């Protein structure tokens, strides 16, 4: 995750802003600079290589002291920054909006995946600039539309029906901020369209998850799609979701947290996110993740008959 201010800076032209991507040498210069505390939140002028991000975001970049940040010296950083600018420059951002826009925290890996989709000549985003820009504006939180299958970050499709598409995420192969844990495995489920879904299509998805992904929890980050993650990683997801939720509220980015369909979401996660939305502390919310929940009556009678026992998955074992 990183703020948009880690990728680009605003340049005032008439009554709105044009966004310009940072170059790696300007960032490198900022990372070595000594800057007064009062100037930590201001864009840094490297003198030689142009404007650089505010020094307060130093930890967002990979250095010899911090291996958890972005690999900003890669060509992928340039592609992601350019794509963000392309999307922001397609809309009008005024002086009253610019601080809010740049403070938004975005998924670096999501944006890299959109670059990969753009470069794939078989993908619809390769052929439609309008859909590409729409996908980016959704990814950076500027659009109120949810991420549907057409505008999704992408990956490898492992399941699809008339209402849902399930993707295996490919973060292990990334350049900008790769997942280093070789045991990482995670999925995302997007809606094919943002409209009411029939019970039969929900039932098909739940049957698939129950039989093929029984070692995983279905959660949501509140953005209109589902994530299918290992139970061992749920606490980590909870920390990130809570931090992003609080940060957005603090910066005035009052984004509605979408709890999604309670029949699909893991019970404990639904309790966690509901508690978070009520304003409870992280400690109180996280207790709900490890609490034994009363099993609700199965909304879909006879669901287990939809699959034969030899189809039960070994994924995640």
Swiss-Prot record:
Xref: Pfam families: Rota_NS35_C, Rota_NS35_N
Gene Ontology MF term list? ATP binding; metal ion binding; nucleoside diphosphate kinase activity; ribonucleoside triphosphate phosphatase activity; RNA binding
Q: What GO biological process term is on the record, naming one?
A: viral genome replication
Identify which cofactors the protein needs according to its UniProt entry. Mg(2+)
| Recorded superkingdom | Viruses
> Does the record's keyword annotation contain Metal-binding?
yes
Active site, renumbered: 225
Q: Where is this region: RNA-binding?
A: 205-241
Q: Where in the cell is it found?
A: Host cytoplasm
Entry binding sites for ATP: 107-109, 188, 221-223, 227
Gene3D superfamilies cross-referenced by the UniProt entry: Rotavirus NSP2 fragment, C-terminal domain, Rotavirus NSP2 fragment, N-terminal domain
Alphabetized, the UniProt keywords read: ATP-binding, Host cytoplasm, Hydrolase, Magnesium, Metal-binding, Nucleotide-binding, RNA-binding
A single Gene Ontology CC annotation of this entry is: host cell cytoplasm
Function as written in the Swiss-Prot or TrEMBL entry: Participates in replication and packaging of the viral genome. Plays a crucial role, together with NSP5, in the formation of virus factories (viroplasms) which are large inclusions in the host cytoplasm where replication intermediates are assembled and viral RNA replication takes place. Displays ssRNA binding, NTPase, RNA triphosphatase (RTPase) and ATP-independent helix-unwinding activities. The unwinding activity may prepare and organize plus-strand RNAs for packaging and replication by removing interfering secondary structures.
Quaternary structure, per UniProt, is:
Homooctamer. Interacts with VP1; this interaction is weak. Interacts with NSP5; this interaction leads to up-regulation of NSP5 phosphorylation and formation of viral factories. Interacts with host DCP1A, DCP1B, DDX6, EDC4 and EIF2S1/eIF2-alpha; these interactions are probably part of the sequestration of some host SGs and PBs proteins in viral factories.
Q: Which family does it belong to?
A: Belongs to the rotavirus NSP2 family.
Q: What is this protein called?
A: Non-structural protein 2
